[in-house]
UniProtKB/Swiss-Prot annotation:
Alphabetized GO MF terms: ATP binding; tRNA binding; tRNA-uridine 2-sulfurtransferase activity
Disulfide-bond pairs as recorded: 104-202
Gene Ontology BP annotations: tRNA wobble position uridine thiolation
Name of the protein described by the UniProt record: tRNA-specific 2-thiouridylase MnmA
Taxonomic classification: Bacteria, Bacillati, Bacillota, Bacillota incertae sedis, Caldicellulosiruptorales
Positions bearing the site annotation: Interaction with tRNA: 129, 340
GO cellular component: cytoplasm
Region forming the signal peptide: none
Family: Belongs to the MnmA/TRMU family.
UniProt-annotated catalytic positions: 104, 202
Species the sequence originates in: Caldicellulosiruptor saccharolyticus (strain ATCC 43494 / DSM 8903 / Tp8T 6331)
EC assignment: 2.8.1.13
Coiled coil: none
Superkingdom in the source lineage: Bacteria
Length: 361
């Protein structure tokens, strides 16, 4: 009997090819798109760039018709609002810089979507992520590994996956490059073969976080820039418009290159300093998830990434109380940012990760 798999289809080339590959491999494939966001007028996003626009549903439906697979649309707007949007806004209001894609993967795609899939009789879910899942019989655990195409690897945003999620998820694209995926799309005669990748956060198509937060919260009071001694340097926009390490768009001249070194939301202050002030060699992370084991019992050596685009750096992670770890880097890291995720690797294996609570100088 064929195993049933529900593919999360965004209307893009990756998830479309994932569905085509699984059908070719003999699975009983179903497709579904999660409608997760609408604008303040109650209308679906209409920008063609967004993975949750009305065009995304149209493109996904066209692909499903070509592949001759059943197709569903799940209304998950309320869940997305409560779980992702509110979290995103709350973190910025706290003076932190969140990664909403990680929260969406953790709570929407691999938790709620998986629950829906199991409820309608599916054996697995699948997505178009570039990552590899393998079962290690010696550990009796599923492992998450980097994709073959290192430049497309998406394991950074998947470190929160549990053993249950990994056991029920398929990543058909893990062993392909992006060019190979586009060629497969042409082979399968899919209309999205040349569709560009989405770049922005899906619910902020213009990439203007500050404008979005102001509109959602009504908080618009200007703040002040101060130096590391507390001296006022000038007027700033509301503090939530800034992130640690930022230099562009400050709109202030001090005669020196200045960077955001700290954010004080309770005082509506943005602390500026010279570049040396944004380097640190340690951090504390919380809200941890480990994949090859349940809990870190002793200090281990890893490589670590402090943001999606960062280079990995050698580090030690040391267990602390209250589900926290101390991460000690061998070299100072630029702009360690509270709210972002730090993800740990052992060669190609994802060890786990957590949310950065604070940097330690």
């Amino acid at each position: 009997m064929k195993k049933k798999v529900l593919v999360a289809m965004s209307g893009g080339v990756d998830s479309s090819v994932a569905a085509a590959i699984l059908k070719e491999e003999g699975y009983e494939v179903y497709g579904a798109t999660m409608q997760i966001w609408q604008n303040e007028c109650g209308e679906e996003l209409i920008t063609g760039k967004s993975c949750c626009s009305i065009y995304a549903v149209d493109d996904a439906r066209k692909v499903a018709n070509i592949l001759d697979i059943p197709y569903y649309v799940f209304n998950m707007k309320d869940d997305f609002r409560k779980i992702v949007i509110d979290y995103f806004i709350d973190e910025y209001i706290k003076g932190r810089t969140p990664n909403p894609c990680i929260m969406c993967n953790r709570k929407i795609k691999f938790e709620l979507f998986l629950k829906k899939a199991i409820a309608i009789g599916m054996d697995y879910i699948a997505t178009g992520h570039y990552a590899i899942i393998e079962y290690d019989s010696s550990l009796n655990r599923y492992l998450l590994k980097r994709s073959k195409a290192k430049e497309k690897d998406q394991t950074y945003v998947l470190y929160n996956m549990t053993q249950e999620m990994l056991s029920k998820t398929l990543f058909p694209l893990g062993r392909f490059s992006k060019d190979e995926v586009r060629k497969l799309a042409e082979k399968f005669k899919l209309p999205v073969a040349k569709k560009p990748d989405s770049q922005e956060i899906c619910f902020i198509p213009d990439n203007n976080y500050g404008k979005f937060i102001e509109k959602e919260t009504g908080i618009r009071e200007d703040g002040v820039y101060v130096d590391t001694e507390g001296n006022i340097l000038g007027k700033s926009k509301a503090y939530y418009n800034y992130t640690i390490g930022q230099r562009k768009g400050l709109g202030i001249s001090t005669g020196k290159r200045m960077y955001v070194v700290a954010i004080k939301p309770e005082e509506n202050k943005v602390v500026l300093g010279e570049e040396g002030k944004i380097f640190a060699d340690a951090l504390i992370a919380t809200d941890l998830n480990f994949i090859p084991f349940d809990k870190l019992e002793s200090e281990i050596e890893v490589t670590a990434k402090i943001r999606y685009t960062a280079k990995e750096a050698k580090a030690k992670i040391v267990p602390m109380e209250n589900n926290k770890v101390l991460v000690k880097f061998y070299e100072k890291q630029r702009a360690i940012t509270p709210g972002q995720s730090v993800v740990f690797y052992n060669n190609d294996i994802v060890v786990g990760g957590g949310i950065i609570e604070k940097a330690l100088v």
